């Protein structure tokens, strides 16, 4: 006997019913064929490749699972992509996430849409889609940040970041906006070291139509300052500064991590401004050297 049923080109199950059956026998025959065809379809679907399996340590904390650091000296190679995107010279899937990320730049809206399925930016190694520009000296980076999916994971992170290199365990300092509204300044003081938090604040609930949260990361020598604008006010310093020394050129840029190793999510960073002549974050608004909101058009000042 051949297959009791088969999948059509449209994906439906077709049952072959022979003619001349009595009503009762025909009903039994139909039922038998239905369940046999269902088993056939299930077996075919089971053979389709699924998502890669993430190790337990890469899973976020839940009521039934404690979040833990990666194994000692665990690393994955970063995947780099040549070619500029907007203001940035290149982009990378730092830490070789199990699923590839993506990024797009819309010149009309000045928006970078960054998607990634990535375990975290924490502990001794990172995974994220990173858009970068090699720079040196004093610099500031600012951007508006939004998450298109309001129901995404609370610890997803959109970051403004300075990294010494593109390895997953690079020395780095970042300011991050989490999906649940946490904002912090954090740094990895040495390669393969644990990240330390320098300061944090909570953005609170966002009413419909609220201005996007705007963050800034400012480098002056070895001193880094977190800048924030929560409700459309001028950027201003938040929390304490942090000290970190970089050797030679570094990678400055924006990135996103879903905090879920096989689930992709998205952040949008807009009105990105890079300034190589750093203004003083602690100057009074409107004073000489004060940090100001960018013009409508995205700019780079060299």
Regions found by a protein language model. Give the residues of each.
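Serine residues within intrinsically disordered or low-complexity segments
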Residues: 9, 22-23, 42-43
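Short, positively charged and aromatic/hydrophobic N-terminal segments
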Residues: 15-16, 23
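Bacterial N-terminal signal peptides
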Residues: 33-45
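Extracellular glycan-recognition regions
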Residues: 50-302
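N-terminal start and proteolytic maturation junction detector
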Residues: 1, 5-6, 15, 56-59
């Amino acid at each position: 006997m051949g297959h009791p049923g088969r999948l059509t080109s449209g994906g439906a199950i077709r049952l072959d019913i022979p003619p001349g059956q009595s009503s009762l026998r025909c009903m039994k025959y139909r039922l038998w064929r239905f369940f046999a065809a269902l088993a056939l379809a299930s077996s075919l679907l089971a053979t389709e490749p699924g998502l890669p399996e993430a190790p337990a340590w890469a899973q976020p904390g839940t009521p039934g699972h404690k979040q833990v650091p990666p194994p000692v000296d665990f690393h994955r190679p970063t995947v780099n992509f040549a070619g500029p995107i907007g203001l940035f010279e290149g982009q990378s899937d730092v830490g070789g996430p199990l699923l590839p990320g993506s990024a797009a730049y819309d010149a009309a809206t000045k928006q970078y849409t960054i998607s990634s399925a990535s375990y975290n930016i924490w502990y001794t190694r990172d995974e994220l889609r990173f858009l970068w520009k090699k720079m040196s000296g004093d610099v500031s980076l600012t951007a508006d940040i939004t998450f298109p999916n309001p129901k995404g994971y609370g610890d997803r992170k959109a970051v403004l970041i300075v990294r010494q290199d593109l390895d997953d365990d690079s020395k780095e300092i970042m300011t991050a906006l989490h999906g649940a509204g946490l904002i912090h300044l954090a740094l990895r003081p040495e390669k393969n070291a644990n990240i330390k938090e320098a300061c944090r604040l909570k953005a609170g609930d966002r009413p419909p139509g609220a201005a996007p949260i705007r963050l800034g990361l400012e480098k002056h020598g070895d001193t880094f300052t977190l800048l924030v604008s929560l409700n459309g006010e001028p950027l201003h310093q938040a929390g304490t500064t942090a000290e970190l020394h970089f050797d030679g050129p570094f990678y400055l840029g924006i990135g996103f991590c879903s905090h879920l190793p096989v689930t992709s999510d998205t952040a949008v960073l807009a009105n990105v401004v890079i300034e190589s002549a750093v203004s003083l974050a602690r100057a009074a608004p409107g004073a000489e050297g004060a940090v100001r909101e960018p013009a409508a058009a995205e700019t780079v000042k060299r």
